[in-house]
């Protein structure tokens, strides 16, 4: 059993949080995973109930965003409005809806695509060459994206945790 906590610095990443315990360990592990997959600047996007985006340039965590995931966004819209309904479908292509259910799904999809495009714009303003590390249980929300040379898919939290475990094993064998 391995238990990890967010750290101020590890694996060449310096955390920007003044109080690192306020950062969820899932975000930290996602960055640890991403740093192993990229030797360039990167942003890591973990897509699930919430979508987290964190930016790292030259080993320095610049900060990030936390936004509602697709399901949360859709459910909040349905719960907060009358006569707006949704289905359980997640669009696999980018487009527009032709009935209320599709409009809710494609609208939430477009909002999340806006987060992705904003992340690309932000990191582009900091570094011209960068990688995009994408993972999470709902990463299929971004299935329509063309796979670019600078995009990597990962099981972020598990691979970040595995990186810590390998490091601990190496420490144990060197003593």
Predicted regions and their residues:
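Gly/Ser/Thr-rich loops at beta-strand to alpha-helix junctions
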Residues: 49-51, 140
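Nucleotide/phosphate-binding catalytic cleft detector across ATP-hydrolyzing
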Residues: 1-42, 60-76, 80-175
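Short beta-strand scaffold segments in enzyme catalytic cores
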Residues: 44, 51-56
């Amino acid at each position: 059993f391995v238990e990890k906590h967010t750290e101020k610095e590890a694996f060449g990443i310096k955390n920007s949080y003044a109080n690192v315990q306020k950062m969820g360990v899932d975000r930290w592990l996602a960055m640890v995973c991403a740093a192993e997959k990229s030797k360039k600047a990167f942003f890591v996007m973990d897509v699930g109930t919430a979508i987290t985006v964190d930016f790292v340039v030259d080993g320095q965590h610049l900060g990030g965003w936390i936004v509602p995931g697709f399901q949360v966004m859709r459910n909040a819209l349905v719960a907060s409005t009358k006569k707006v309904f949704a289905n359980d479908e997640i669009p696999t292509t980018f487009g527009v809806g032709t009935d209320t259910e599709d409009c809710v799904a494609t609208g939430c999809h477009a909002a999340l695509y806006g987060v992705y495009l904003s992340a690309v714009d932000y990191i582009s303003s900091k570094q011209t060459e960068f990688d995009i590390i994408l993972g999470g249980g709902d990463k299929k929300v971004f299935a329509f994206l063309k796979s670019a040379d600078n995009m990597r898919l990962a099981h972020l939290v598990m691979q970040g945790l595995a990186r810590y475990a390998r490091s601990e094993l190496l420490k144990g064998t060197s003593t």
